Structures are given as C-alpha cells and as structure tokens.
C-alpha cells in the first residue's frame, strides 16, 4: 500500500493522480471539532477560560486548520509573558510550587519594589505568571488569520469534485 499526501493536489501530473485509487479530501475542522482542538491544546496551560469563552473562540476561528488553532493557543499562552516584559519593577512574595520566593510585577512605589526587567530576575522559574485569560485570546485572535486562503479552498473543492471524496 502506498499513501501520499499533498496540500496542492491540483498541481500533480495526471499519471500520478491516477496511480492512487482513492483521493480523500479532509476538510477544515467545523465548529465542534475546533472547540475540541482548543480544549485539547489548553490542557497543559493554566487558564481562566469558561466553556462559553471557548465556544466563542471556536465560532470565531472559521477556516482555521488544526495547525492554525495550535498556533493561536500557543500565541495566547505567551501574552502574560509579553505583558511582564514591559514592567520595570518586581517584588518578591512568598513562594509557591517549591520556590522560596516568587516575583510579581509591581509599581515603583510599592513596598519591596526592585528595579529590574523580567529578564534580570535571577531564577526564571520564580516568576509568578498570571493565568491566560479571555482577553489574551481576543488580542491574539485579532492578529491571527487562517493560513488557508479562499482560492486554496476553491481549488480543493474542484479537485475533490473531479477526482476524490470529501471526509468531514
């Protein structure tokens, strides 16, 4: 058995196309599948998203591939770090997760404020990052676009009508 895969099947030579008995088109994930993908990608990320917020994300990621959804979740997971990179003052608080101390951002006039950038904190594991929240996702969603273009989808549909079978 020979299995082949391509994201541009319409560019293949006719002889190669005819070599394969079955040509299957696996379409982009629908809303329920996108929701499951988001939930799966969130499983190791500390977050505050509700089921309704995850549903909102699933509904607003039409035309996103599985890879696009993975990138969206990973990008949103970095938002708290991006926020912390802008702070100029941190203070120590009693530690969690086995750390003697944790560092959190603060204002210059806060008691215990130490002038330093996040990159200057002695032990990066002692930085207490906030949980990823819905605002982080909304911000990320604003700048993230699906990688699949409308013309590509049209080409897939034409190829599937002529040669293959669609799997949803």
Where are these regions (language model features)?
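Non-catalytic, surface-exposed connector residues within folded enzymatic/regulatory domains
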Residues: 14, 48-51, 131, 150
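C-terminal engagement/docking regions of AAA+ P-loop ATPases
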Residues: 1-3, 10, 59, 64-70, ...
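Conserved nucleotide-binding/hydrolysis micro-motifs of P-loop NTPases
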Residues: 7-11, 28-33, 42-45, 63, ...
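Conserved AAA+ ATPase "sensor/coupling" helix adjacent to the nucleotide-binding pocket
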Residues: 36-48, 56, 60, 75-83
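Residue-level signature of catalytic and energy-coupling elements of molecular machines
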Residues: 6, 20, 34, 65, ...
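Core residues of folded domains in eukaryotic genome-function proteins
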Residues: 22, 74-77, 128
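Generic alpha-helical segment signature
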Residues: 5, 31, 47-50, 130
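Conserved AAA+ ATPase core "coupling" helix
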Residues: 1, 13-43, 52-56, 71
